[in-house]
């Protein structure tokens, strides 16, 4: 009977150790930018604060009013597909000071782009208006996937 209890305890210990080890490895390799596809619209001051305090993630800077909704939908779908989230700054936000540029709010990217930042530094960006609307979501997914591999995964 003692051998049976010892065996059960040993097996339980191994299972627990494997579970902890797997959780550690999974968290070690997890991305800093994971999420569920949410694209959070920030005010200019919120963006400035985010870039100063964190500055890591996918950032969309919108300027073209007519294409903003189309671009946002494609970016959201690509983010959902790649399990990441991002932030958006609209150049026509009521609190966006027209005498200032996106640089004044912590962004170095061009207008109508999705960019990836790490610790406040622009790593790369994709120009949304350079792609045919029928291919944009695919291009965005590829951009996000390669950015995750290059900048956020060990």
Where do the PLM segments sit?
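Local sequence-structure signature of Cys/Sec-based thiol-disulfide redox active-site neighborhoods
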Residues: 44-83
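Short, structured coil/loop segments at alpha-helix boundaries
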Residues: 3-4, 61, 65-69, 95-99
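Short linear motifs at secondary-structure transitions and domain/linker junctions
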Residues: 32-37, 61-63, 87-93
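N-terminal leader/targeting and pre-domain segments
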Residues: 2-55, 136-139, 144-154
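Generic ordered-secondary-structure signal
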Residues: 24-26, 34, 64-65, 78, ...
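Thioredoxin-like thiol-disulfide oxidoreductase module
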Residues: 73, 84-153
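A generic short-segment signal for beta-strand/edge and adjacent turn/coil regions
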Residues: 26-31, 80-86
